[in-house]
Regions:
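Conserved kink/hinge residues within transmembrane alpha-helices of Major Facilitator Superfamily
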Residues: 139, 193-194, 205, 338, ...
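Membrane-embedded alpha-helical core segments of multi-pass
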Residues: 133-141, 162, 191-192
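Hydrophobic alpha-helical segments that mediate membrane insertion or helix-helix packing
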Residues: 200, 311-312
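Phosphate/pyrophosphate-binding loop motifs in nucleotide- or prenyl diphosphate-using proteins
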Residues: 308
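Membrane-water interface segments at transmembrane-helix boundaries in multipass membrane proteins
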Residues: 2-134, 164-187, 217-305, 313-329, ...
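Short loop segments and helix-boundary regions at transmembrane helix junctions
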Residues: 10-15, 145-152, 190-229, 369
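Alpha-helical transmembrane segments of multi-pass membrane proteins, especially transporters
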Residues: 160, 185, 212-213
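Short, non-helical or kinked segments that cap or interrupt transmembrane helices
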Residues: 145-163, 202-208, 347-354, 373
Length: 433
């Protein structure tokens, strides 16, 4: 037995070394043009210079990093297998044995509430946190369509754009306020969700993804070319900002203002903090709404449809209504986020709603874990903060961003907090008992 264990460990170590060597070779080939060779200006002429020590350090770091990563992954897999063999608990006991998720959620909420107070003098931090919350809200909206209903949507940014332009037009053309336009914009985007969902009822997988991708591009092209309505490529400017119960965030004047009403000295940070708490309120309401929907029959129908559509139809579930409701609710939540985006920016254009935005939102849902609310929050933090932290490394910013995404998918293939647990393991455990 000892000889067998020793041989297994030797094979595992050899496999790890081979894998790390492969990564080092790939890093060497990619690093020669990116790191090993560079151009320097010498007397007005460009000359090729070499940086072999930096390249060697990069290759060594990749080799050691991959070796360490494989070791950690193997240890985690071994520990998981040991735990599964020793686990005799029922599914309900396993679910209740994760109280740290609840503590993590409450901790994140407390941190979000106190963040503007802790960074009241740092507008950049509050602005970045506001951007994170926008993507959290978008991720929760797309999570209804992709994570719960299992419908791959590559054009989700279209609903984001419809909500933003609806508020922009209602506020600039008709003088509507933020809270007046918010439910109307949600209804408009929900109707667009039904409009998209109706012709795609019989489509699945890749075909559905292609249709939704085309829908997103159609919306963007319409916004670019319909200049009378959308302003074309120039967009819509002078969009009113939301106020605090009618009190604008302006310097004191003849009209009552927020600072004057509360006896404060005027500061531009007041509006930034107010917008942060506003999107935090919208995000919390979105979370409560989606969590409640998941407990209702419609939410259970979404998840059942995701697992096996044919079985759902055999049980009498109306697949058409289930799909349309997922598209409509997901679109409505994206429209709410679009309304806030337009109100925050004061200016929107079609360039704000490209396919890249859809890809980022989908990546947030996938990396966070399909169907996981808290996972969407963590993935939004990673995907929004990484590019911000990499601004000082402009040359390697996207390289670091892509490497982080790859590492997350290697470490957690089901997402940071995978919601879908394999049921067969519990069934086999019950059968064994």
């Amino acid at each position: 037995m000892a000889t067998l264990v020793l041989a297994t460990r030797q094979e595992s170590a050899a496999a790890r070394l081979k894998d790390a060597a492969t990564v080092a070779v790939v890093a060497l080939l990619l690093g020669i043009p990116m790191i090993g060779l560079t151009t320097v200006d010498q007397g007005g002429a460009l000359r090729v210079a070499t940086r072999w020590p930096a390249l060697a350090a990069f290759v060594a770091a990749c080799f050691c990093g991959r070796l360490l990563l494989r070791y950690v992954i193997d240890r985690l897999r071994q520990r998981r297998r040991t735990r599964e063999h020793a686990d005799t608990a029922t599914p309900n006991e396993n679910t209740a044995a994760n109280p740290w998720l609840n503590r993590l959620g409450w901790g994140a909420l407390a941190f979000a509430l106190l963040l503007p107070v802790a960074f009241s003098d740092n507008r950049y931090v509050v602005d970045t946190a506001t951007t994170v919350l926008i993507y959290v809200m978008l991720g929760w909206g797309l999570n209804v369509v992709v994570g719960l209903a299992g419908l791959l949507d590559l054009g989700y940014v279209a609903f984001y754009a419809v909500g933003a332009y609806t508020y922009a037009l209602l506020s600039t053309q008709f003088g509507w306020g933020f809270w007046q336009a918010l439910p109307v914009a949600g209804g408009v985007t929900a109707s667009f969700g039904i409009l998209l969902g109706w012709p795609t009822l019989r489509l699945r997988g890749d075909y559905l993804a292609i249709v939704t991708l085309g829908f997103g591009e159609i919306i963007r092209i319409v916004l670019v070319n319909w200049t009378e309505m959308s302003g074309g490529p120039n967009g819509i400017t002078s969009i009113p900002r939301p106020s605090f119960f009618g009190l604008p965030f302006k310097p004191p004047g003849d009209a009552p203002t927020f600072a004057a009403a509360f006896g404060l000295e005027f500061s531009p940070s007041h509006r930034v903090i107010f917008l942060y708490y506003l999107i935090l309120l919208l995000a919390l309401l979105t979370n409560l709404f989606v969590s409640r929907m998941r407990q209702l029959p419609i939410g259970r129908a979404w998840e059942a449809m995701r697992e096996d559509e044919i079985a759902c139809k055999a049980m009498g579930i109306n697949a058409r209504n289930v799909k349309l409701s997922a598209f409509a609710i997901g679109a409505m939540l994206g429209g709410f986020a679009g309304v806030f985006f337009a109100a925050r920016q004061g200016f929107i254009s079609p360039e704000s709603f490209t396919f890249n935005e859809s890809a980022i939102i989908l990546a947030i849902v996938v990396l966070g874990g399909m169907g996981s609310q808290l996972g969407v929050v963590l993935a939004s933090l990673v995907l929004v903060l990484l590019p911000e932290l990499g601004r000082d490394f402009a040359e390697y910013r996207m390289l670091l961003f892509g490497a982080a995404m790859i590492l997350i998918m290697i470490w957690k293939p089901g997402g940071i907090l995978a919601h879908r647990e394999p049921t067969l393991r519990y069934l086999s455990g019950s059968a064994a008992r």
